[in-house]
A protein has these predicted regions:
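Sequence context surrounding c-type heme c attachment/ligation sites in exported
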Residues: 7, 41-53, 63-80
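Electrostatic cytochrome c docking/interface patches
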Residues: 19-45
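The canonical Cys-X-X-Cys-His
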Residues: 13, 49-58, 113
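Alpha-helix N-cap and coil->helix boundary residues
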Residues: 31, 47-50, 93
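Axial heme c-ligation environment in periplasmic c-type cytochrome domains
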Residues: 1-10, 14-28, 64-69, 87-121
Length: 121
């Protein structure tokens, strides 16, 4: 499809698409997202799961060079990353911080948090 475009056409398309604002993704299940909001802001009582916001910020903006931005990540991606931490397949977290947190989270906790994060901006 793009093979027939001239170099100028490609530049024009690039200029056009670079001005487009991404549409925010919203949670598909609002009840799940509300549960995720509670976990994100307050952790899971009695399990040792801290509030995500304590490291990643109240809006998921992160702290550069320390804790990554989470806001706006797709729910499937966030869930997959939490699960790889839980399984020990991902190990780029200093002092095993995320691995120890994810190990204490249920599958439902992870899905709820992922759903909430998707709607953050």
């Amino acid at each position: 499809m793009v093979a027939s475009l001239s170099p100028q056409d490609m530049l024009n398309l690039a200029a056009y698409y670079s001005t487009q604002k991404p549409k925010p993704d919203t949670a598909k299940d609002q009840v799940l997202a509300l549960t995720g909001q509670k976990i994100f802001r307050g952790g899971v009582q009695g399990t040792g799961v801290p509030a995500c916001a304590s490291c990643h910020g109240p809006q998921g903006q992160g702290i550069p060079a320390q804790f990554p931005r989470l806001a706006g990540q797709h729910a499937d991606y966030t869930y997959a990353q939490l699960n790889t931490f839980r399984l020990g397949e991902r190990a780029n977290d200093p002092a095993k911080m995320m691995r120890s947190i994810a190990a204490k989270m249920t599958d439902a906790d992870m899905k709820a948090v992922a759903s909430y994060i998707q709607g953050l901006r």
